[in-house]
Regions:
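Extracytosolic helix-loop segments that constitute the early lumenal/periplasmic catalytic or substrate-binding loops
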Residues: 46-70, 77
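Transmembrane-helix signature of polytopic, membrane-embedded enzymes
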Residues: 111-135, 153-154, 170-171
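Perimembrane helix-loop-helix junctions
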Residues: 2-4, 193-221, 246, 279-293
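Membrane-interface alpha helices of multi-pass inner-membrane proteins
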Residues: 157, 172-188, 194-200, 308-314
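Loop-to-helix entry region of an early transmembrane alpha helix in multi-pass inner-membrane enzymes
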Residues: 76, 80, 88-109
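Hydrophobic/aromatic-rich transmembrane helices and adjacent perimembrane loops
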Residues: 192, 319-347
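Transmembrane-helix motifs of polytopic, lipid-linked glycan transferases
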Residues: 15-18, 98-119, 134, 158
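Extracytoplasmic
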Residues: 360-506
Length: 506
């Protein structure tokens, strides 16, 4: 029967390939327009640029005296990677987005390599990669902007898959640990890769290797924590305690269920075909025969996906400020690898799967039209021109990246407001760590400085969002500054318009 269907199978593969080519071009065009858009793509996109800019000027971005203006809750690795390029070409929006783009593409290339090592067909491997690419560019998410998420995800994937690719040799386990620690200092939740691998080693490969991996990981992590805390004084206030202390304030079960629902709808055709695959094997009473289950990538992939789903449900998926990027970074790589591997085991996949997989790519890319970056520039050139005429501007986070590009001081990088949360040591933490009173003192001095500058009219211009009028000094602004009007600009990747108010000294 299969022999008689070969012409149709070949035709299905050809048609599928043509669709994949179309979606690849569509995604590349969208990504290029996103990267080259010369204005902010989101409200807080400038935050990471402030850390890079500090490094370029020989400063420690986690120096307590530079807080809260340089508050960075994510980690030091992303700014360190961008640093040499910024030193050569300037601390620009473009340079940062290009680095992000590189790691998005590197993650896609690595997933393709993993699939090929799992003997998945080239066409299905490309489909999986394009689905991941579309996920990482999805409108409304921060991954493709000036954000360390793509870098952290890349290191997490290396942490998980390198040992499998190298047959779990001790050398590969050590490399995995190093990438896991790098992932932690890029975005802390990317440390999940080490938990996935250590547990997988213990249960499916070798208890000895699992214990050795965990012990070495613990030792090197402890050494790194001591070294980082000593050399970067505000690091753990910014990157660890802030997030830990704010967990309860941003937890939302409603947000979790909304994201699960949206993620499921975006992948409905893939999930449907996974169900078909399972039914296919149940009714045919076939088993997935793995010569060595511990060494087979699909078992590791399912294990990693299960861990990711667990973390999303009980923690990160409840973040009220997140919109799918945790799902796309932590779950999608493993879901799509598993899906492509499964479809490849259905002999008739070019006929049975192609229509549904094309529909899923169509669903994922429906909102990714590159024209949005050219059609929504109104107001940005004028606002940028106004900024260029003044030196000392009390700023909205929205324009932080523009101030960095123009070499001007800034006062709110988009994360500044969260700095105070890093001082507290709650719950069991009180038994091990002291409250950091330096944070309270630094924040008090910051507010005092802002208020003094307003009263003395030291700001040449104030540009703030109406809702952020701001930082406890709204009355002083109205007393010493004159309202000049409002500008409305659009952030394409955020899919939001932002209004800013302009004030000049009386």
């Amino acid at each position: 029967m299969i022999k008689n269907l070969r012409p149709f199978l070949l035709a299905g593969q050809v048609i599928f390939t043509l669709f994949l080519l179309y979606f690849a071009v569509r995604l590349v065009c969208y990504h290029f327009a996103l990267v080259t858009f010369p204005y902010p793509n989101g409200l807080r996109e400038g935050a990471m640029m402030t850390s890079t800019n500090a490094l370029v000027h020989g400063l420690d971005p986690y120096d307590m005296s530079l807080q809260p203006q340089l508050m960075n809750p994510y980690g030091i690795v992303y700014p360190l990677i961008v640093w040499p390029f910024a030193a050569l070409f300037g601390t620009t929006i473009l340079i940062h987005r290009m680095v992000t783009a590189f790691f998005i593409l590197a993650s896609c290339a690595f997933i393709f390599y993993v699939l090929r090592r799992m003997n998945t067909s080239i066409i299905l491997s490309i489909w999986s990669v394009l689905m991941l690419y579309a996920s990482l560019l999805y409108p409304g998410t921060s991954t493709p902007t000036i954000d360390p998420g793509a870098v952290g995800m890349f290191f997490m994937l290396l942490t998980v898959f390198i040992p499998w690719l190298c047959r779990f040799s001790y050398r590969s386990l050590f490399v995995s640990i190093l990438f896991g620690i790098l992932a932690f200092y890029t975005k802390p939740y990317a440390f999940l890769g080490t938990i996935i691998l250590s547990s997988y080693l213990f249960f499916f490969v070798s208890k000895k290797k699992g214990l050795i991996y965990g012990a070495v990981l613990l030792a090197l992590s402890a050494i790194s924590v001591v070294a980082v805390a000593y050399s970067l004084p505000a690091y753990f206030d910014d990157c660890f305690f802030t997030s830990l202390n704010m967990t309860h304030s941003w937890e939302s079960m409603q947000r979790l269920y909304y994201q699960i629902n949206l993620y499921s709808r975006l992948h409905q055709w893939t999930l449907l075909m996974i169900c078909v695959f399972l039914i296919w094997h149940i009714f045919n009473r076939t088993k997935v025969r793995l010569q060595d289950p511990a060494r087979h990538g699909i078992l590791l992939t399912v294990w990693a996906g299960s861990w990711s789903a667990f973390v999303l449900y009980f923690s990160l998926g409840r973040h009220s400020g997140a919109m799918l990027w945790y799902f796309f970074q932590l779950l999608s790589p493993f879901l799509l690898v598993g899906a492509a591997w499964a479809f490849n085991r259905i002999e008739l996949w070019p006929i049975l799967c192609t229509p549904f997989l094309v529909l899923n790519l169509l669903t994922m890319t429906a909102g990714q039209d590159y024209k949005v970056f050219y059609d929504h520039r109104d107001g940005w050139p004028e606002l940028t021109m106004v900024i260029s005429k003044y030196q000392n501007i009390l700023n909205s986070p929205l324009i932080a990246s523009l101030l960095v590009e123009q070499g001007k001081p800034l006062y709110d990088n988009g994360q500044t407001e969260y700095f105070l949360s890093g001082a507290e040591r709650n719950g069991w933490m009180r038994g091990f760590f002291k409250q950091d009173d330096r944070v309270y003192l630094q924040m008090l001095m910051f507010f005092k400085d802002i208020r003094s500058k307003i009263e003395n009219k030291e700001f040449d211009l104030i540009i703030l969002q109406p809702s952020l009028l701001p930082l406890g000094v709204g009355d002083e602004i109205k007393e010493f500054y004159k309202y000049e009007g409002q500008a409305v600009v659009y952030a394409p990747q955020d899919q939001k318009p932002y209004a800013v108010t302009l004030w000049r000294p009386l």
